[in-house]
Amino acid sequence: RANGRYVGDDLERLGRKLIEAVKAVHAAGIVHRDIKPTNVMVSNTGPVLVDFGIAMGEGESHVTRTGLVMGTPGFIAPEIIDGAESDEMSDWWSVASVLAFAATGEPVFGTKPMMAVLERAAAGSANLAGLPAGTMAAFRSALDPDRTKRCTPDELLQAIALDALNPQAWISGNTSD
């Protein structure tokens, strides 16, 4: 870790374990719907996904009775804000946002005002400054507002692992160093 950020091998390990955890949740037929940094507890054995308070099983309605969307700005997928049902792909967008937060040390869509955070997420305007080129490109893809253009969690992890081979890239934010 560097300056509170997860970089290189540390980010790759965090990402791999978090992705494994979310895959297990999805294999059980559950969509978490609220993956954010405060719901990822880091233990000696890796991250633990917590707070399944708004999680839903397959076939359940994913919108509240009043039609309100549940989630945390900056960590809720853009399509959910537009009224789409939560699903595995929206959880994966949230995982990418959490990992980008871990890599940069701050929420990549900002913190306020809330509407501005939602607008930046909807536009795919993540602040990924300082990340190596390959990792940055993979995060841009994983956080794309158009879900059909997003890379898979495994592709994101592969880009992080590749950049982890060059520790200097995480210092300079440029894999060509």
Can you describe what each PLM-predicted range is?
Residues 1-176:
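Eukaryotic protein kinase
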